[in-house]
Swiss-Prot record:
Gene3D superfamilies: Methylpurine-DNA glycosylase (MPG). Belongs to the DNA glycosylase MPG family. This is Putative 3-methyladenine DNA glycosylase. Signal peptide: none annotated.
Length: 204
């Protein structure tokens, strides 16, 4: 079952924690690639100095952040790595949640090919398959083509995981500072990164 539009509404910190344990799904050439979300970061622009939309900054890149919740915000870092975010909060409030890491579930062979151009990989390579925002986008085939796509689409969405299979039943959720935002002054210390304690696919 796909997460309904109402799932993405409300406080961004609440939505960030709600996303943990559910599946990010991308259908590529008819093949389902997915993973359990195990690490996220919340960004609460325009007051959050770590957010692309800090100060209400509105550009072609960030325009989707000002739209309806439940859409994909994809951007490129270092000119080569894609990052996938879920838009939250009401229209006109540019906030979102970065998906930082996944535990691979469906389409793992295709994900291996996408990341390493081979399926015979080492244990270390498998652990590195989706344990970072750029890595998971490469594995799932998420690019700038997905920017602005509704997460109600057949090909890109969040799939709700039943309570009995949910990782939150076996893992504690930890809150801490976000990663790689040294430029963000006091926002560096906001405990807006949420992840499953000791999960092997958490990025750090």
């Amino acid at each position: 079952m796909q997460a309904p539009p109402s799932f993405y509404e409300g406080d961004t910190l609440v939505v960030a924690k709600k996303l943990l344990g559910h599946k990010l799904v991308h259908i590529v050439d008819g093949i389902k690639r997915s993973g359990f979300i195990v690490e996220v970061e919340a960004y609460k622009g325009p007051d959050d100095k770590a957010a692309h939309s800090y100060g209400g900054r509105r550009t072609d890149r960030t325009e989707v952040m000002f739209g309806a919740p439940g859409h994909a915000y994809v951007y490129l870092i270092y000119g080569m790595y894609h990052c996938f975010n879920v838009i939250t909060a009401p229209i006109g409030t540019p906030q979102g949640v970065l998906i930082r890491a996944l535990e691979p579930v469906d389409g793992i062979e295709d994900m291996k090919l996408a990341r390493y151009n081979k399926t015979d990989i080492t244990k270390a390579q498998y652990k590195n398959l989706t344990n970072g925002p750029g890595k998971l986008c490469r594995a799932l085939g998420i690019t700038l083509e997905e920017r602005g796509v509704s997460l109600q689409s057949d090909t890109l969405h969040i799939e709700l995981v039943p309570e009995e299979d949910h990782l939150s039943s076996t893992h504690n959720i930890i809150a801490g500072p976000r990663i790689n935002i040294d430029y963000a002054e006091e926002a560096v210390h906001y405990p807006w990164r949420f992840y499953y304690e000791k999960h092997p696919f958490v990025s750090k």
